[in-house]
Design a protein with these regions (language model features):
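Short, compact, well-ordered microdomains
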Residues: 54-92
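Compact soluble domain cores
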Residues: 1-64
Length: 92
């Protein structure tokens, strides 16, 4: 399965952390690859099913959660798949 992410953007918090830590940048990149492969990471089972449905239908929000070394990031694609944001949960 593949889907359209639209424009990929990140919050200032994510951009700041990438600039400060090469390891964090690698984590974001690896998570993006997982997201594009429809590997929803640490997302709950119900949201994984909703994500799969959104991919099949070509519309609907998609949200995935990835965790590493005590850090959590989200990837959120808007309902119309026009853009995807990488963010920290507290930035939502």
């Amino acid at each position: 399965m593949r889907f359209t992410t639209g424009r990929l953007v990140m919050t200032r918090g994510i951009a700041h952390e990438i600039a400060a830590s090469e390891d964090f940048g690698i984590f974001v990149t690896e998570s993006l690859h997982r997201y594009l492969d429809c590997d929803w990471g640490d997302t709950c089972t119900e949201d994984k099913a909703l994500n799969d449905e959104s991919v099949i239908n070509g519309e609907g929000d998609i949200l995935a959660v990835y965790k590493k070394d005590g850090r959590t990031i989200w990837f959120k694609t808007e309902w119309d798949h026009s853009y995807t944001t990488v963010l920290f949960p507290e930035e939502y």
